[in-house]
């Protein structure tokens, strides 16, 4: 495997490279054959919205001059929409952090199969979170994604519960190669960030 280099993209660069990001998305998330175009278009629509969110940040990895992985996120809206549908009470300190704009949502972590289990995902998350002033990071993951859940546990994340967003809600989820559909049950995980 070639050496992997990680770099940060500005909002403008992310918008300019959206087609390349979508290519990685399609390759990383092996969906139903024949649905690639629809999945790609849905991703591009959501990505265009996410790039405009407050606190958007993104890192990309490449190996041998080719894309290997992408990760991005943003500060969660203060309205608490992220937590709706959670099957447990949101801890008061998490609510306080959300209202004060101190929660970073890891929206996507896409690692191509050839680069999985090599530490790339760990490095991507670490680099992405370096510049945020948030006190907490959270994400949603498909509970059947054993590799993703295992990575979260090894990184010291805590599961808050399962959530089913309203059918109309578009809530990003991380899959490390296994996508989650809109309205699907996801597990909500979080981790405190040290200053």
Summary of predicted features, one role per range:
Residues 122-123, 136, 143-171, 179-181:
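Conserved active-site alpha-helix within GNAT-family acetyltransferase domains
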Residues 2, 66-70, 104, 184:
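Glycine-rich phosphate/pyrophosphate-binding loop shared by adenosine-nucleotide-utilizing enzymes
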Residues 106-113, 117-130, 150-154:
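Conserved acetyl-CoA-binding loop-helix of GNAT-fold acetyltransferases
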């Amino acid at each position: 495997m070639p050496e992997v280099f990680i770099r940060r993209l500005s909002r403008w660069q992310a918008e300019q490279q959206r087609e390349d990001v979508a290519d990685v998305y399609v390759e990383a998330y092996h969906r139903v054959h024949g649905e690639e175009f629809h999945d790609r278009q849905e991703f591009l629509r959501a990505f265009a919205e996410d790039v405009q969110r407050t606190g958007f940040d993104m890192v990309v990895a490449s190996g041998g001059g080719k894309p290997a992985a992408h990760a991005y996120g943003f500060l969660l809206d203060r309205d608490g929409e992220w937590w709706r549908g959670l099957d447990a009470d949101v801890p008061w300190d998490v609510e306080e952090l959300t209202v004060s704009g101190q929660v970073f949502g890891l929206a996507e972590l896409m690692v191509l199969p050839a680069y999985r289990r090599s530490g790339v995902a760990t490095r991507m998350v670490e680099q992405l979170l370096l510049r945020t002033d948030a006190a907490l990071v959270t994400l949603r993951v498909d509970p059947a994604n054993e590799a993703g859940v295992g990575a979260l546990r090894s990184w010291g994340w805590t599961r808050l519960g399962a959530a089913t967003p309203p059918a109309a809600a578009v809530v990003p989820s991380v899959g490390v190669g296994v996508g989650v559909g809109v309205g699907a049950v996801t597990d909500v995980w979080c981790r405190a960030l040290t200053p």
